[in-house]
Amino acid sequence: MPESPSTTAVAAELHVIADQADRLRERVGSLAEPFLGTDREDLVSAIHEAERQLRMAERSLQRALKTAR
């Protein structure tokens, strides 16, 4: 029978990944700033949608982290 992985190790990995998702969300969000108020609202909208998706991913990872602890 295979050994089950340590929840401590899983929690640590989830913490690192959630932190990375947060930093990526911030980076992605800042990409829209130069285009605010220009005729590139299509680009701003797409960037903001990507930022929202990263926020949702981070929240899901945080929930998984709480479950693993």
Give a label for each model feature:
Residues 1-31:
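N-terminal acidic leader/helix
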